[in-house]
Amino acid sequence: MSAKDTPAPQAAEPGRAQPVEVPGGGHWWRRLLAFAGPGYLVAVGYMDPGNWATDVAGGAQLGYLLLSVILLSSLMAMLLQALSARLGIASGLDLAQACRERYSPSTCRLLWLACETAIIACDLAEVIGTAIALKLLFGLPLAWGALLCVGDALLVLVLIGRGQRPLEAFVVALLTLIFACFAVQLLLSRPELGEVLQGFLPSPRVLSDPAALYLAIGIVGATVMPHNLYLHSSLVQSRAYPRSLAGKRKALRWAVADSSLALTLALLVNAAILIVAASVFHRNGHTEVVDIEQAHALLSPLLGLELASLLFAVALLASGLNSTVTTTLAGQIVMEGFLRLRLAPWARRLLTRGVAVLPVLLVTLLYGEDGTARLLIFSQVILSMQLPLAVIPLLQFVSDRRLMGPLAIGAGTRWLAWAVALAIVGLNLQLLADFAFG
Protein backbone atom coordinates (compact mmCIF):
# COMPACT_ATOMS: atom_id res chain seq x y z
CA MET A 1 0.00 0.00 0.00
CA SER A 2 1.44 3.38 -0.98
CA ALA A 3 1.94 6.25 1.42
CA LYS A 4 -1.06 8.13 0.13
CA ASP A 5 -3.28 5.07 0.72
CA THR A 6 -2.40 4.67 4.38
CA PRO A 7 -4.81 5.92 7.00
CA ALA A 8 -4.08 9.40 8.24
CA PRO A 9 -2.48 9.37 11.68
CA GLN A 10 -4.55 12.32 12.86
CA ALA A 11 -8.27 12.86 12.52
CA ALA A 12 -10.18 16.10 12.80
CA GLU A 13 -12.02 14.94 15.85
CA PRO A 14 -13.12 17.52 18.41
CA GLY A 15 -12.07 15.60 21.46
CA ARG A 16 -8.60 14.82 20.00
CA ALA A 17 -9.19 11.10 20.54
CA GLN A 18 -7.29 8.42 18.66
CA PRO A 19 -8.88 7.63 15.27
CA VAL A 20 -11.10 4.56 15.20
CA GLU A 21 -9.48 1.79 13.17
CA VAL A 22 -11.39 0.46 10.15
CA PRO A 23 -10.73 -3.17 9.10
CA GLY A 24 -9.50 -3.51 5.53
CA GLY A 25 -11.17 -6.87 4.96
CA GLY A 26 -13.54 -9.37 6.50
CA HIS A 27 -17.32 -9.26 6.58
CA TRP A 28 -19.08 -6.06 5.52
CA TRP A 29 -20.75 -5.72 8.92
CA ARG A 30 -17.35 -5.28 10.60
CA ARG A 31 -16.70 -2.21 8.44
CA LEU A 32 -20.22 -0.93 9.08
CA LEU A 33 -19.69 -1.30 12.83
CA ALA A 34 -16.35 0.49 12.55
CA PHE A 35 -18.04 3.44 10.85
CA ALA A 36 -21.15 3.31 13.05
CA GLY A 37 -21.18 6.04 15.67
CA PRO A 38 -21.02 9.52 14.12
CA GLY A 39 -24.49 9.06 12.63
CA TYR A 40 -25.93 8.23 16.05
CA LEU A 41 -24.25 11.24 17.65
CA VAL A 42 -25.89 13.34 14.94
CA ALA A 43 -29.25 11.56 15.41
CA VAL A 44 -29.31 12.72 19.04
CA GLY A 45 -30.19 16.20 17.81
CA TYR A 46 -33.19 14.79 16.00
CA MET A 47 -34.65 13.32 19.20
CA ASP A 48 -33.95 16.09 21.70
CA PRO A 49 -36.61 17.64 24.00
CA GLY A 50 -37.40 20.28 21.37
CA ASN A 51 -38.70 17.56 19.09
CA TRP A 52 -40.87 16.25 21.90
CA ALA A 53 -42.54 19.64 22.39
CA THR A 54 -43.39 20.17 18.73
CA ASP A 55 -44.43 16.54 18.20
CA VAL A 56 -46.68 16.47 21.27
CA ALA A 57 -48.29 19.82 20.39
CA GLY A 58 -48.70 18.80 16.75
CA GLY A 59 -50.27 15.44 17.56
CA ALA A 60 -52.62 16.79 20.23
CA GLN A 61 -53.83 19.79 18.20
CA LEU A 62 -53.85 18.40 14.66
CA GLY A 63 -53.98 14.63 14.98
CA TYR A 64 -51.84 12.77 12.47
CA LEU A 65 -51.66 15.71 10.01
CA LEU A 66 -48.01 16.57 10.66
CA LEU A 67 -46.68 13.03 10.21
CA SER A 68 -46.01 14.03 6.61
CA VAL A 69 -43.87 16.93 7.85
CA ILE A 70 -41.87 14.58 10.09
CA LEU A 71 -41.31 12.22 7.15
CA LEU A 72 -40.31 14.95 4.68
CA SER A 73 -38.06 16.74 7.17
CA SER A 74 -36.36 13.43 8.04
CA LEU A 75 -35.69 12.75 4.35
CA MET A 76 -34.33 16.29 4.00
CA ALA A 77 -32.12 15.64 7.02
CA MET A 78 -30.76 12.40 5.53
CA LEU A 79 -29.80 14.25 2.34
CA LEU A 80 -28.17 17.18 4.14
CA GLN A 81 -26.28 14.95 6.59
CA ALA A 82 -25.02 12.84 3.68
CA LEU A 83 -23.71 16.03 2.06
CA SER A 84 -22.12 17.08 5.35
CA ALA A 85 -20.33 13.72 5.57
CA ARG A 86 -19.26 14.10 1.93
CA LEU A 87 -17.69 17.49 2.66
CA GLY A 88 -15.71 16.17 5.63
CA ILE A 89 -14.46 13.04 3.87
CA ALA A 90 -13.68 14.60 0.48
CA SER A 91 -12.03 17.83 1.66
CA GLY A 92 -10.68 16.90 5.09
CA LEU A 93 -12.38 20.04 6.42
CA ASP A 94 -15.43 20.43 8.57
CA LEU A 95 -18.06 22.97 7.53
CA ALA A 96 -16.75 25.70 9.84
CA GLN A 97 -13.18 25.29 8.56
CA ALA A 98 -14.39 25.38 4.95
CA CYS A 99 -16.26 28.61 5.67
CA ARG A 100 -13.14 30.13 7.21
CA GLU A 101 -11.08 29.23 4.14
CA ARG A 102 -13.61 30.42 1.55
CA TYR A 103 -15.38 33.41 3.12
CA SER A 104 -14.27 36.80 4.42
CA PRO A 105 -13.63 37.26 8.16
CA SER A 106 -16.77 39.40 8.57
CA THR A 107 -18.93 36.75 6.88
CA CYS A 108 -17.39 34.06 9.08
CA ARG A 109 -18.16 36.05 12.21
CA LEU A 110 -21.78 36.41 11.09
CA LEU A 111 -22.08 32.68 10.40
CA TRP A 112 -20.40 31.86 13.70
CA LEU A 113 -22.86 34.04 15.63
CA ALA A 114 -25.79 32.44 13.78
CA CYS A 115 -24.53 28.96 14.60
CA GLU A 116 -23.89 29.83 18.24
CA THR A 117 -27.46 31.17 18.40
CA ALA A 118 -28.70 27.84 17.06
CA ILE A 119 -26.61 25.91 19.61
CA ILE A 120 -27.94 28.05 22.46
CA ALA A 121 -31.51 27.54 21.19
CA CYS A 122 -30.88 23.80 21.16
CA ASP A 123 -29.33 23.98 24.62
CA LEU A 124 -32.35 25.93 25.80
CA ALA A 125 -34.58 23.05 24.74
CA GLU A 126 -32.31 20.57 26.54
CA VAL A 127 -32.39 22.59 29.77
CA ILE A 128 -36.18 22.76 29.72
CA GLY A 129 -36.55 19.09 28.81
CA THR A 130 -34.11 17.86 31.44
CA ALA A 131 -35.60 20.13 34.12
CA ILE A 132 -39.09 18.85 33.30
CA ALA A 133 -37.86 15.24 33.47
CA LEU A 134 -36.29 15.87 36.89
CA LYS A 135 -39.55 17.41 38.08
CA LEU A 136 -41.63 14.51 36.79
CA LEU A 137 -39.34 11.84 38.25
CA PHE A 138 -38.22 13.45 41.52
CA GLY A 139 -40.58 16.38 42.14
CA LEU A 140 -37.90 19.07 41.75
CA PRO A 141 -39.18 22.59 40.94
CA LEU A 142 -38.43 23.57 37.34
CA ALA A 143 -36.08 26.40 38.34
CA TRP A 144 -33.99 24.07 40.54
CA GLY A 145 -33.88 21.49 37.78
CA ALA A 146 -32.64 24.12 35.33
CA LEU A 147 -29.86 25.13 37.73
CA LEU A 148 -28.83 21.49 38.18
CA CYS A 149 -28.43 21.24 34.40
CA VAL A 150 -25.35 23.47 34.68
CA GLY A 151 -23.60 20.58 36.44
CA ASP A 152 -23.73 18.35 33.38
CA ALA A 153 -20.39 19.84 32.35
CA LEU A 154 -18.85 17.14 34.57
CA LEU A 155 -20.66 14.39 32.63
CA VAL A 156 -19.44 15.80 29.31
CA LEU A 157 -15.87 16.11 30.58
CA VAL A 158 -15.80 12.47 31.77
CA LEU A 159 -17.28 11.12 28.53
CA ILE A 160 -15.04 13.09 26.19
CA GLY A 161 -12.02 12.11 28.26
CA ARG A 162 -12.85 8.41 27.76
CA GLY A 163 -12.41 8.63 23.99
CA GLN A 164 -14.55 8.35 20.89
CA ARG A 165 -15.90 4.81 21.21
CA PRO A 166 -17.07 5.00 24.86
CA LEU A 167 -18.72 8.32 24.04
CA GLU A 168 -20.55 6.76 21.11
CA ALA A 169 -21.53 3.71 23.18
CA PHE A 170 -23.07 5.95 25.87
CA VAL A 171 -25.10 7.82 23.27
CA VAL A 172 -26.29 4.65 21.50
CA ALA A 173 -27.34 3.09 24.83
CA LEU A 174 -29.52 6.10 25.69
CA LEU A 175 -30.96 6.20 22.17
CA THR A 176 -31.92 2.54 22.54
CA LEU A 177 -33.62 3.34 25.85
CA ILE A 178 -35.61 6.18 24.26
CA PHE A 179 -36.68 3.95 21.37
CA ALA A 180 -37.76 1.15 23.71
CA CYS A 181 -39.80 3.52 25.89
CA PHE A 182 -41.75 4.87 22.94
CA ALA A 183 -42.20 1.46 21.35
CA VAL A 184 -44.04 0.38 24.50
CA GLN A 185 -46.13 3.57 24.59
CA LEU A 186 -47.02 3.15 20.93
CA LEU A 187 -48.34 -0.35 21.62
CA LEU A 188 -50.32 0.91 24.61
CA SER A 189 -51.93 3.79 22.68
CA ARG A 190 -53.38 1.52 19.94
CA PRO A 191 -53.50 4.05 17.08
CA GLU A 192 -55.74 3.64 14.03
CA LEU A 193 -53.43 2.29 11.32
CA GLY A 194 -55.42 3.76 8.43
CA GLU A 195 -55.37 7.26 9.93
CA VAL A 196 -51.64 6.95 10.65
CA LEU A 197 -50.88 6.02 7.03
CA GLN A 198 -53.09 8.88 5.83
CA GLY A 199 -51.07 11.26 8.01
CA PHE A 200 -47.89 10.45 6.10
CA LEU A 201 -49.46 11.89 2.91
CA PRO A 202 -48.80 15.65 2.44
CA SER A 203 -51.83 17.92 2.90
CA PRO A 204 -52.30 21.55 1.70
CA ARG A 205 -53.73 22.34 5.14
CA VAL A 206 -50.18 22.42 6.51
CA LEU A 207 -49.52 25.60 4.49
CA SER A 208 -52.99 27.17 4.69
CA ASP A 209 -53.49 26.83 8.46
CA PRO A 210 -51.21 29.30 10.38
CA ALA A 211 -51.22 27.10 13.50
CA ALA A 212 -50.25 24.05 11.45
CA LEU A 213 -47.56 26.00 9.61
CA TYR A 214 -46.05 27.31 12.85
CA LEU A 215 -45.82 23.79 14.27
CA ALA A 216 -44.57 22.42 10.94
CA ILE A 217 -41.71 24.90 10.86
CA GLY A 218 -40.98 24.04 14.47
CA ILE A 219 -40.77 20.37 13.46
CA VAL A 220 -38.41 21.25 10.59
CA GLY A 221 -36.28 23.29 12.98
CA ALA A 222 -36.29 20.49 15.53
CA THR A 223 -35.51 17.83 12.92
CA VAL A 224 -32.94 19.46 10.62
CA MET A 225 -30.44 20.93 13.08
CA PRO A 226 -28.03 23.55 11.69
CA HIS A 227 -25.22 22.70 14.12
CA ASN A 228 -25.49 19.01 13.17
CA LEU A 229 -24.16 19.88 9.71
CA TYR A 230 -21.00 21.26 11.33
CA LEU A 231 -20.80 18.34 13.75
CA HIS A 232 -21.16 15.54 11.19
CA SER A 233 -18.56 16.97 8.79
CA SER A 234 -16.02 16.73 11.62
CA LEU A 235 -17.03 13.44 13.24
CA VAL A 236 -16.75 11.42 10.01
CA GLN A 237 -13.02 12.17 10.03
CA SER A 238 -12.58 10.27 13.30
CA ARG A 239 -12.21 7.01 11.33
CA ALA A 240 -8.76 5.88 10.15
CA TYR A 241 -9.70 5.13 6.54
CA PRO A 242 -7.24 5.46 3.61
CA ARG A 243 -7.16 9.06 2.38
CA SER A 244 -6.94 7.94 -1.26
CA LEU A 245 -9.83 8.54 -3.68
CA ALA A 246 -10.89 4.88 -3.45
CA GLY A 247 -10.64 4.98 0.35
CA LYS A 248 -12.72 8.15 0.50
CA ARG A 249 -15.40 6.67 -1.75
CA LYS A 250 -15.72 3.62 0.50
CA ALA A 251 -15.68 5.76 3.64
CA LEU A 252 -18.43 7.93 2.19
CA ARG A 253 -20.65 4.93 1.48
CA TRP A 254 -20.27 3.62 5.03
CA ALA A 255 -20.72 7.07 6.58
CA VAL A 256 -23.95 7.64 4.64
CA ALA A 257 -25.21 4.17 5.63
CA ASP A 258 -24.42 4.96 9.27
CA SER A 259 -26.23 8.32 9.29
CA SER A 260 -29.21 7.05 7.26
CA LEU A 261 -29.79 4.13 9.65
CA ALA A 262 -29.47 6.43 12.67
CA LEU A 263 -31.84 9.03 11.20
CA THR A 264 -34.35 6.30 10.36
CA LEU A 265 -34.37 5.48 14.08
CA ALA A 266 -34.92 9.19 14.80
CA LEU A 267 -37.79 9.26 12.29
CA LEU A 268 -39.45 6.31 14.03
CA VAL A 269 -39.10 7.93 17.47
CA ASN A 270 -40.47 11.31 16.32
CA ALA A 271 -43.35 9.65 14.50
CA ALA A 272 -44.09 7.56 17.61
CA ILE A 273 -44.23 10.67 19.82
CA LEU A 274 -46.70 12.38 17.49
CA ILE A 275 -48.77 9.21 17.00
CA VAL A 276 -49.03 8.66 20.76
CA ALA A 277 -50.10 12.31 21.23
CA ALA A 278 -52.66 12.06 18.42
CA SER A 279 -54.13 8.72 19.48
CA VAL A 280 -54.22 9.46 23.21
CA PHE A 281 -54.94 13.22 23.36
CA HIS A 282 -56.46 14.36 20.05
CA ARG A 283 -58.72 11.32 19.74
CA ASN A 284 -60.08 11.90 23.28
CA GLY A 285 -60.70 15.62 22.76
CA HIS A 286 -57.65 16.89 24.67
CA THR A 287 -56.48 19.19 21.86
CA GLU A 288 -55.29 21.80 24.36
CA VAL A 289 -52.24 19.71 25.33
CA VAL A 290 -49.35 21.94 24.27
CA ASP A 291 -46.52 20.95 26.57
CA ILE A 292 -44.61 17.95 27.85
CA GLU A 293 -45.88 18.18 31.45
CA GLN A 294 -49.50 18.09 30.35
CA ALA A 295 -48.75 15.08 28.19
CA HIS A 296 -47.12 13.28 31.12
CA ALA A 297 -50.03 14.06 33.45
CA LEU A 298 -52.65 12.77 31.03
CA LEU A 299 -50.91 9.66 29.69
CA SER A 300 -51.56 7.37 32.65
CA PRO A 301 -55.23 8.37 33.23
CA LEU A 302 -56.09 8.00 29.54
CA LEU A 303 -54.16 4.77 28.99
CA GLY A 304 -54.95 3.34 32.41
CA LEU A 305 -51.33 2.45 33.23
CA GLU A 306 -48.87 4.31 35.48
CA LEU A 307 -46.07 2.74 33.45
CA ALA A 308 -46.86 4.99 30.46
CA SER A 309 -46.04 8.21 32.33
CA LEU A 310 -42.92 6.70 33.92
CA LEU A 311 -41.53 5.60 30.55
CA PHE A 312 -42.28 9.04 29.13
CA ALA A 313 -40.28 10.78 31.89
CA VAL A 314 -37.35 8.32 31.72
CA ALA A 315 -37.08 8.75 27.95
CA LEU A 316 -37.20 12.54 28.33
CA LEU A 317 -34.32 12.49 30.82
CA ALA A 318 -32.28 10.22 28.52
CA SER A 319 -32.95 12.60 25.64
CA GLY A 320 -31.72 15.62 27.59
CA LEU A 321 -28.55 13.84 28.79
CA ASN A 322 -27.73 12.67 25.28
CA SER A 323 -28.21 16.07 23.70
CA THR A 324 -25.88 17.79 26.12
CA VAL A 325 -22.95 15.72 24.80
CA THR A 326 -23.49 16.53 21.14
CA THR A 327 -24.11 20.25 21.59
CA THR A 328 -20.81 20.51 23.46
CA LEU A 329 -18.97 18.76 20.62
CA ALA A 330 -20.71 20.94 18.02
CA GLY A 331 -19.85 24.08 19.97
CA GLN A 332 -16.17 23.15 20.07
CA ILE A 333 -16.12 22.42 16.33
CA VAL A 334 -17.83 25.69 15.45
CA MET A 335 -15.69 27.88 17.69
CA GLU A 336 -12.42 26.26 16.64
CA GLY A 337 -13.36 26.12 12.96
CA PHE A 338 -14.52 29.71 12.59
CA LEU A 339 -12.30 31.50 15.13
CA ARG A 340 -9.37 29.11 15.70
CA LEU A 341 -10.31 29.41 19.37
CA ARG A 342 -10.38 26.24 21.47
CA LEU A 343 -11.84 26.00 24.96
CA ALA A 344 -11.70 23.07 27.36
CA PRO A 345 -14.90 20.99 27.03
CA TRP A 346 -16.04 21.82 30.57
CA ALA A 347 -15.52 25.57 30.00
CA ARG A 348 -17.37 25.44 26.70
CA ARG A 349 -20.20 23.51 28.36
CA LEU A 350 -20.52 25.94 31.25
CA LEU A 351 -20.53 28.93 28.90
CA THR A 352 -23.34 27.79 26.60
CA ARG A 353 -25.34 26.07 29.32
CA GLY A 354 -25.14 29.18 31.51
CA VAL A 355 -26.49 31.33 28.67
CA ALA A 356 -29.30 28.83 28.04
CA VAL A 357 -30.32 28.54 31.71
CA LEU A 358 -30.91 32.29 32.16
CA PRO A 359 -33.96 32.56 29.83
CA VAL A 360 -35.50 29.48 31.46
CA LEU A 361 -35.15 31.00 34.93
CA LEU A 362 -36.43 34.38 33.72
CA VAL A 363 -39.50 32.93 31.99
CA THR A 364 -40.24 30.68 34.98
CA LEU A 365 -40.09 33.65 37.37
CA LEU A 366 -42.14 36.01 35.17
CA TYR A 367 -44.71 33.69 33.60
CA GLY A 368 -44.59 30.57 35.74
CA GLU A 369 -43.80 27.07 34.57
CA ASP A 370 -46.45 27.25 31.81
CA GLY A 371 -44.35 29.84 29.97
CA THR A 372 -41.51 27.39 29.42
CA ALA A 373 -43.67 25.26 27.10
CA ARG A 374 -44.03 28.12 24.61
CA LEU A 375 -40.35 28.98 25.06
CA LEU A 376 -39.47 25.40 24.13
CA ILE A 377 -41.44 25.49 20.86
CA PHE A 378 -40.14 28.99 20.08
CA SER A 379 -36.57 27.70 20.42
CA GLN A 380 -37.27 25.20 17.64
CA VAL A 381 -38.55 27.96 15.35
CA ILE A 382 -35.32 29.88 16.03
CA LEU A 383 -33.38 26.79 14.96
CA SER A 384 -35.33 26.63 11.73
CA MET A 385 -34.60 30.31 11.03
CA GLN A 386 -30.85 29.60 11.30
CA LEU A 387 -30.95 26.66 8.89
CA PRO A 388 -30.38 28.56 5.61
CA LEU A 389 -27.13 30.04 6.99
CA ALA A 390 -25.73 26.52 7.39
CA VAL A 391 -27.37 24.79 4.43
CA ILE A 392 -26.43 27.31 1.72
CA PRO A 393 -22.66 27.29 2.47
CA LEU A 394 -22.74 23.48 2.64
CA LEU A 395 -24.34 23.22 -0.81
CA GLN A 396 -21.85 25.70 -2.25
CA PHE A 397 -18.90 23.71 -0.96
CA VAL A 398 -20.05 20.22 -1.97
CA SER A 399 -20.71 21.54 -5.50
CA ASP A 400 -17.19 23.03 -5.80
CA ARG A 401 -14.86 20.72 -7.75
CA ARG A 402 -11.80 22.72 -6.67
CA LEU A 403 -12.55 21.79 -3.07
CA MET A 404 -14.17 18.39 -3.49
CA GLY A 405 -12.37 17.01 -6.55
CA PRO A 406 -14.11 13.97 -8.10
CA LEU A 407 -16.39 13.70 -5.05
CA ALA A 408 -18.25 16.93 -5.85
CA ILE A 409 -21.98 16.26 -6.19
CA GLY A 410 -23.54 15.77 -9.62
CA ALA A 411 -26.22 17.87 -11.27
CA GLY A 412 -29.14 15.71 -10.08
CA THR A 413 -28.11 15.79 -6.43
CA ARG A 414 -27.33 19.50 -6.72
CA TRP A 415 -30.83 20.30 -8.03
CA LEU A 416 -32.45 18.21 -5.31
CA ALA A 417 -30.33 19.76 -2.56
CA TRP A 418 -31.08 23.31 -3.71
CA ALA A 419 -34.79 22.46 -3.87
CA VAL A 420 -34.56 21.43 -0.21
CA ALA A 421 -32.75 24.67 0.63
CA LEU A 422 -35.39 26.75 -1.17
CA ALA A 423 -38.16 24.87 0.63
CA ILE A 424 -36.55 25.70 3.98
CA VAL A 425 -36.16 29.39 3.04
CA GLY A 426 -39.74 29.50 1.73
CA LEU A 427 -41.17 28.04 4.93
CA ASN A 428 -39.27 30.60 6.99
CA LEU A 429 -40.47 33.51 4.82
CA GLN A 430 -44.05 32.28 5.17
CA LEU A 431 -43.65 32.16 8.94
CA LEU A 432 -42.26 35.73 9.01
CA ALA A 433 -45.18 36.92 6.87
CA ASP A 434 -47.66 35.31 9.26
CA PHE A 435 -45.99 37.01 12.21
CA ALA A 436 -45.86 40.40 10.43
CA PHE A 437 -49.42 40.44 9.09
CA GLY A 438 -51.16 38.28 11.67
Curated annotation (Swiss-Prot):
One GO CC term, this protein: plasma membrane
Segments crossing the lipid bilayer: 60-80, 118-138, 140-160, 169-189, 211-231, 261-281, 297-317, 350-370, 375-395, 415-435
Primary localisation category: membrane
One protein family per Pfam: Nramp
Compartments where found: Cell inner membrane
UniProt KW keywords: Cell inner membrane, Cell membrane, Ion transport, Membrane, Symport, Transmembrane, Transmembrane helix, Transport
Any GO MF annotation of the entry: metal ion binding
Biological process, per Gene Ontology: iron ion transmembrane transport; manganese ion transport
Region annotation (Disordered) ranges: 1-20
Membrane topology: Multi-pass membrane protein
NCBIfam families linked: nramp, Nramp_1, PRK00701.1
Its biological purpose: H(+)-stimulated, divalent metal cation uptake system.
Family under the similarity heading: Belongs to the NRAMP family.
Descriptive protein name: Divalent metal cation transporter MntH 2
Organism: Pseudomonas aeruginosa (strain ATCC 15692 / DSM 22644 / CIP 104116 / JCM 14847 / LMG 12228 / 1C / PRS 101 / PAO1)
